[in-house]
């Protein structure tokens, strides 16, 4: 058993060293050179103090043991003072190297680490992201706060450690040279100083990992809510999110307090230094009495041992950060070193010289890695001939999209093989394989860059002409050309500034520009309106010519021209043939599906005679390009005069108030009081110790042995007393400040998230407020503020206490010398303060750069399937490199200032010592002070200088802390233009649901020059269903955004029940409105939790959940899953098919029992059979409710009480289905129906 424990211990040591190495794994040749020079600088800086002590011993011996009236007295003093000035010059050089080199290499290595980490994450196979449900928040944390931890260690904490270690070594060398007997006696005290530090470091590794794991859970809650803020707002889920976030934070609070206690015990243990002085004073007196040692030499050796010990203790206090960085670095290296099973970077594998595109699935067996109990394919076979179009149809969740995922090698099958041109795809080079395919997914993933850049994701080296041609082929060129910035228009995070149809057309252009051999279309036209769909369908059919095409569609009218149609059911192909062949089998699966869809269109086919519709359709085609459905906002967004002021203030946060920060800590006032008292007492210990030390030195120069023994006993006991006090006070101080800091951090995070979730949707649409950037601020800023209030506040109180007491004592003992020594203190303070100001101005840009990196990382991970499909990893890495260019330049400047600041402050300290001794010698010679007064005053005020220097060492933390506090209050103080909790708002228990738009003007804040509505009016009757139809980008979804009050109109009024929507208490109003969006947003929880999210009450019965699921036609598929309602949905519902997600979203809305139901393409993702049943369910749910239905598929809205037709942001027609058709070919609705009938 003992041997096993020994082996385990050995393994832990190896792991520890391995994790420490991980901090430096990102260094290149230049970094090693910088670290080498920085090492010389840090070691040189450390050796400066022992050298100063060596010279000081000579000065003290001159002062204490010489006759003050001789001519040689001042000569000796002057000579040794000049020697101190030489040391100061050398100190300047080494300190500059230390400051410059470490700051520079810290930024270089962390920038490279971010790049390697993101590259490694994007290299992982899709299965990795399925299994790591918090991967998005993990990546944000690693790219922002984790890289910040490593940069802090490399730039500041590591050089501090090296400097402290070299001070320790240098001190012992000087001690042995001057008085080896005393040095040997002091040697055992090292053990007493080292053990607490090592124990603390070991405990900290465990605690810091646990804290990180605890916060990751909270960060994931926040990231989900912010990235899906429209869903959170629509379902009034803010309080649920805050409650879940708060619960997740509680664990990290307890661990943080535990960490503070461990730190208090460790630093308190350094009080052993005082006890050591007690022993060394006694033993030193014996050296003086019996071995002829001089007092100055005894002091220098004892001081060297004490300073060496204190330095080692100070170095060990940096272990906290060092081990934390090692823990972070190890976790990051695990990801970087992870080689995925399906490796897109692996150059091995065949590249076919000429690819025909014949695809074959042979006896494939497959389950998703995250749902091993649910079999998707078992002995699945499919053959796609070269150059042919094969359409896959079947129920939602039958495995159609899995075919595309397996063909692209997102996953590998468990058994069987997949062949292209007779070659198994696992033998082909992964990147080459994917380059032969063009993918258009059901939910198009766009990146927060320009339209042009998004299309170029398909082909890196394409020309502008290629981009335009691809856009024309996907029917996107016209609407892009109408935008003010054309192809340079920013699409926003996840493409939020584009309508669904516009996003889909950009995604199709991205696939077409690739000129792929194999075209994969997964519901490629599901988001398009009728007119766009027809043209894009033609474009896709043209693109399919000569290419192998696999087409998945619920709308069977889009696939009737396919060469082969295969019906998938329960993971098997149950029918195969052409449309005509399959229709011959009346009882077949395919003919049944077609029959279901034809029933929906019977009325249309009877009513419409397809005739002279070319002109109207042409008009529609032109009109659909004019308006752009922007859903976003940017830094110069405008929602009215008050908002202009509001947004400009966003960018200018007021100077942070420390008083306000303390006010937030008011509930912990007892801990604050105890902590401050403890810090004040610990501050007083330093001057008391210095006074005892100065007095003790003067004792060594006494001639009476009895007097030496008596006074030595008194001072030795006082040192022991100080040691005990120091231990107890430190424990109290660090525990209380950790308690304060942790609860403040929790409170700040809760209040920030709570405040953020009151901001208008336009704020989230701005580039700088992406979910990644906000989560990064939640993680990082609160941590920095905690450090400011905890560790830094304690240090400030200590410093004030020590300085006040020391200055008073110095002035009482020897006022002339004290005044000179106090007068030069500001010089050192100014150096540190200047360094702080320079670093503060530059740290802002560093933080901004990390936000940019976080935003990019979050977006990349969210769209990892698209990146994988298009092998766009390199393009993302170039975007990251571009985002870091500006901060790289700033870092170089920052390094120079860091070097100069440290060099000046450290070298001036030695200069002041030279001045103190020279001037003190003059005062002694002139008879103004005694040697005892000089030693006491010098010790007291020099120790104060050290305290100020220690306080100065936190200038970097203060700079970062000040920015973080400013960032926190900028969020907390921001005025919300659409306040969901307006106390004056009208709260209503129920609404009838009459909606009216009166002379509404509206443009999305990001593009105020593109008018969506101008004098727009519409009345939606209570309890009736109103369908909104029209071309893509005509303003249909904008109506829903205004009813939900995501935005306010620029002019005019939106009324509900005859009352201006702005007069309502917004959250109470939203309780009566339910939204089902085109792209359903689910949260990472169980199906049950996602449905309950729609509940207004906190207590929802199981029967209500099942009833809602049945109404949405979801109950059957949910109960067929192994875990049933407890099935985990995955991040954003990735574990479920599009149709399954949509049905859960509908169930969530049904559970709300709303007065107003908003359906934005609610059935677009469903297959025909599900659509019919859900459509019936929705129609039942719509009875007696005000329903606003947006649909491209006109067959789904013909039973609505009223149909409103929009074009170019205007209401051009209104009536029932039959009354609008009766207008004939001149009517726009007639034309839209005719287009769908033609394509059907």
UniProtKB/Swiss-Prot annotation:
Annotated binding of ATP 1, by residue: 394-401
Keywords: ATP-binding, Glycoprotein, Membrane, Nucleotide-binding, Repeat, Transmembrane, Transmembrane helix, Transport
Membrane topology note: Multi-pass membrane protein
UniProt xrefs under SUPFAM superfamilies: ABC transporter transmembrane region, P-loop containing nucleoside triphosphate hydrolases
Location within or outside the cell: Membrane
One GO CC annotation: membrane
Main location as per UniProt: membrane
Positions that bind ATP 2: 1030-1037
Span list, region Disordered: 617-646
Bilayer-crossing regions: 35-55, 82-102, 158-180, 184-206, 264-284, 296-316, 681-701, 714-734, 794-813, 817-839, 895-915, 923-943
GO MF terms held by the record: ABC-type transporter activity; ATP binding; ATP hydrolysis activity
Gene3D superfamilies the record matches: ABC transporter type 1, transmembrane domain, P-loop containing nucleotide triphosphate hydrolases
Any Pfam family the entry gives: ABC_tran
InterPro entries (alphabetical): AAA+_ATPase (IPR003593), ABC1_TM_dom (IPR011527), ABC1_TM_sf (IPR036640), ABC_transporter-like_ATP-bd (IPR003439), ABC_transporter-like_CS (IPR017871), P-loop_NTPase (IPR027417)
Entry protein name: ABC transporter B family member 15
Source species: Arabidopsis thaliana (Mouse-ear cress)
